[in-house]
Amino acid sequence: MSRIGKLPITIPENVDINYNDSEITVKGKFGTLQTQIPTVIKITESDNILTVGLSEQTRSVRALHGLYRTLINNMVIGVSEQFEIILELKGVGYRAAVQNNEIILNLGYSHPVNIKIPNIISVEVVQNTTINLKSCDKELLGLFAANIRAWRQPEPYKGKGILYKGEQIIRKAGKSAK
């Protein structure tokens, strides 16, 4: 039995969960999330505690146990508390702004970079160099943050680029003179 899969999921009071054999829907104050689940995953609910079980014990099914328990737990946390990722822009002239449901990045290219913001994600720019991303969907939030970061990944010589908050860049020494 999976160590993560056997852990119970506590459901907050303001979260509503509906499920059948192939789908689970989680509603809360920050939104509604829905995902498909395999029919071999069995969900039971009692006293605001959700447990994820298996209908058969084959190797491939046991591999899904912890995965779907974590996905459901992330949905519950997301609709009740939201997830947040903070990106920092480091570099001369690197700036960010939000305009018309797009984030506009000046990253040293000859043109500004425009990235469309998904509906489920809220973006706030603080002091032109810090981007706060919030969403109830952890997977989509991580993908969007990685998409923004891919435009200027941090480089090891000067430390310029787009960094996650708290990320440490391992610096390299430049060329040494003879």
From Swiss-Prot:
Q: Which domain of life is it from?
A: Eukaryota
Q: Which UniProt keywords apply?
A: Chloroplast, Plastid, Ribonucleoprotein, Ribosomal protein, RNA-binding, rRNA-binding
Does Transit peptide show up as a keyword for this record?
no
Q: How does it assemble?
A: Part of the 50S ribosomal subunit.
The gene name reads rpl6
Q: Name one Pfam family in it.
A: Ribosomal_L6
**HAMAP family annotated for this entry?**
Ribosomal_uL6_B (MF_01365_B)
Q: Which InterPro entries match?
A: Ribosomal_uL6-like, Ribosomal_uL6-like_a/b-dom_sf, Ribosomal_uL6_a/b-dom, Ribosomal_uL6_bac-type, Ribosomal_uL6_CS
This entry carries the following GO cellular component terms, namely:
chloroplast; ribonucleoprotein complex; ribosome
Q: What GO annotations for molecular function exist for this entry?
A: rRNA binding; structural constituent of ribosome
Q: Where in the cell is it found?
A: Plastid, Chloroplast
Which protein, by its recorded name, is this?
Large ribosomal subunit protein uL6c
Native organism = Phaeodactylum tricornutum (strain CCAP 1055/1)
Q: What does this protein do?
A: Binds 23S rRNA.
Instruction: Indicate the family of this protein.
Output: Belongs to the universal ribosomal protein uL6 family.
Its GO biological process annotations read: translation
